[in-house]
Amino acid sequence: MRKILAFFFLVGFAVGAFGQEHKVNWMTVEEAVAAQKKEPRKIIMDMYTNWCGPCKMLDKYTFQNEDVASYINENFYAVKFNAEGDSSVAFKGQTFTNPNFDPARVRSRNSQHQLASYFGVHAYPTVLFLDENANLLTPVKGFYKPKQLEIFLKVFATNDYKTVTTKEQWVDYQKNFRSEFN
């Protein structure tokens, strides 16, 4: 009987361990900026909308990938931001809202949030990379698979972006980059 119970315990543990989703530790903009003051890190911000199919794919297939989630959690503060939502956000001494938000259109296209406009976001998904002082480094537009997003994560986490300043250097960087993500 003990062997049977032990077997089911181990099987249950194995299924739980292998069946779990890998989660990015998402936080609000304000939480990320406050965390930067205690321990400086760059911010990665996923600007999404509720109606956006590629946004849902990025969340499901990329941000829940074990390698991506682990790397983001170790190297960045991660913000998931609804670019058409109704939240009020205090950022860089300003308050950003969505004054034209229509609650009846919460599942479809809505008006753009002022924070998305501040960052110049007009396509979804857009992943923003911000430096340790919450200044925009670059937007990355569109859906990326884990191996495709990896180069962006690493070029910013390692500060290689500081030495890759021309298009030619970026092309060389891409040619020499070796993916480690699954």
Residues of each region from the PLM?
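A short beta-strand-turn-helix
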Residues: 24-42, 72
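Short active-site neighborhood of thiol/selenol oxidoreductases, capturing the structured segment around
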Residues: 39-56, 78
